[in-house]
Amino acid sequence: MSQSSVRNFCIIAHIDHGKSTLADRLIEMTGTLRHDEMCEQVMDSMELERERGITIKAKAIRLRYISKDKQEYRLNLIDTPGHVDFSYEVSRTIAACEGAILVIDATQGIQAQTLANVYLAIEYNLEIIPVINKIDLPGADIPRVMGEIKSVLGYDEDSVLQISAKLGLGVPELLEAIVNKVPAPKGNANQPLRALIFDSHYDPYKGVVAYLRVADGNINKGDDLRLMGQGTEFRVLEAGYFAPAQVAALRLDVGDVGYIATGLKSVGECRVGDTVTLQHGGAIQPLIGYHPAKAMVFAGIYPTQTDDYHELREAMEKLSLNDASLSSEPESSPLLGHGFRCGFLGLLHLDIIVERLEREFNLSLVVTSPGVSLTVTRIGGEAFTVVNPNEMPLPHEIARIEEPWVSVVIITPSKYIGTVMDLVRENYGVYKNTEYLGQLAMSELGQRVQLHYDMPLRSILTTFHDQLKSRTQGYASLDYEFIGYRDANLSKIDVLVNDVPVDAFSRIIPPDKAHEIGEALVKKLKEMIPRQLYQVTLQAAIGSKIVARADISAKRKDVIAKCYGGDITRKRKLLDKQKEGKKKMRQIGKVEVPKEAFLSVLKLQ
């Protein structure tokens, strides 16, 4: 098929705006799958994706379409995740396309992540086709959403399509818009091969299977190829496309989206975003459009049973094969044994990795409290990165601490502006500006407002999103983007059990919250640690300063139970002996902190 008849496009949307359902209708209406082969969310092949109703990994599928003027087109649809944590996957996908269908829910309007993805598409010069979905729902407010699209994105009403992906309304018109508006790929078939890898997975028989978009030249089975970034060399064992299952083909031409089986044993050798070229006579300049994923959230993952460490290690290796944005390195804790310190794109990413480890590999896990990476400079001038609270130097050794900050966009009905501003202020947010979304965008909740803030990443790590949803009755949406490191006033709080620090309970916190957090920690531990034969002292400390304390009183054995009447000195002698024994026991005794105590402390936000 000629290059002019190829169209590469993706679907971008906020989470749950009907992106995967629209992909299903496009697959069905182009006859790519028979009706009996269809299932809901064809593109979401991972069980977890269907269950949660979200797209986690980018997918690709080739569609054959005959237009109204009887011309045949090859449409390559790349499905993308919508959640903020997976914006890295979105950026890779967008770099492989010429067009994007922007899906906006008729009941919800423009959301924060919709805007983030639109700006990304504009950055890569994609042709954007705006679509209002779910027009069949009773709550659809098309004039309001149309007003938002016009004022925020600048599209007039004539260029916005109205569809119902569920019922198939307006989808034939959308297919026509794709072939008429999305430009054909620009590459040159006579130039040396250049192809962008936008995803990959590990196959036990074929090695790493790389999903790619051919920008120049072509790929044939048996070609000797090289990755320009990594320098890895391999031979193409198989080339093909997705329909949506893998279909082997003799070759992939310029503009095609497909896959190659590389035979490589680790996705680490075949990094997503790299450029593939020929080993001999290959291209000199790699393709642009790649930003490496940067882990923003760190947490420790440990097996509940220490004997399961080897199974966890194998599971982490297998997940790393398919997830380029997951980083992990071994670490050990006196309380939890051996485990891994892992880096994630965000909290949903962490949640999904843990759920996949437990579900796919049948593991029972303990996950430590998530934190961010800090840049710490010692008084001598040496700077280093801290991802684990236990790596933090003593307060008197630290010259400065820097933490990651994010630019936050919150879209909310104007009715909730006050409560949202209070929430952000409580979490150290710095106000930037306010924008109103369109003149027509009014409802009983008031006009919708876009609030811009700068915030420390640690502030939105734990319960911020849940609190935002609960304070706005679910109407607010959130998006954030990393903007750099800024000076931070932070301290490490330690928990001491009988004057012995327990590493697993250490946290990095703002000093103004020290008393509140310290009290909560020792109170929870007092409830969970069983009583001993001697008094146990629990303390929360920053450096040498104790900020909270609780005592677990000793169990008392009645040593004078056998004494009946008689001289008091006999009883006193026994009580003094008991006191001495307890004192000695306290010096040499070791308090076993149960794992349940650790888990209950983790749940404290």
Swiss-Prot record:
Topology term for the membrane: Peripheral membrane protein
Enzyme class label: hydrolase
Cysteine-cysteine disulfides: none
SUPFAM superfamilies for this protein: EF-G C-terminal domain-like, P-loop containing nucleoside triphosphate hydrolases, Translation proteins
Subcellular location: Cell membrane
Molecular function (Gene Ontology), one example: GTPase activity
Ranges of residues in domain tr-type G: 4-186
EC number: 3.6.5.n1
GO biological process, one term: positive regulation of translation
UniProt binding sites for GTP: D16, H17, G18, K19, S20, T21, N133, K134, I135, D136
Gene Ontology CC terms, in alphabetical order: plasma membrane
Reactions performed catalytically: GTP + H2O = GDP + phosphate + H(+)
Summary of the function given for this chain in its UniProt record: Required for accurate and efficient protein synthesis under certain stress conditions. May act as a fidelity factor of the translation reaction, by catalyzing a one-codon backward translocation of tRNAs on improperly translocated ribosomes. Back-translocation proceeds from a post-translocation (POST) complex to a pre-translocation (PRE) complex, thus giving elongation factor G a second chance to translocate the tRNAs correctly. Binds to ribosomes in a GTP-dependent manner.
Protein family membership: Belongs to the TRAFAC class translation factor GTPase superfamily. Classic translation factor GTPase family. LepA subfamily.
Protein name as catalogued: Elongation factor 4
Taxonomic source organism: Dehalococcoides mccartyi (strain ATCC BAA-2100 / JCM 16839 / KCTC 5957 / BAV1)
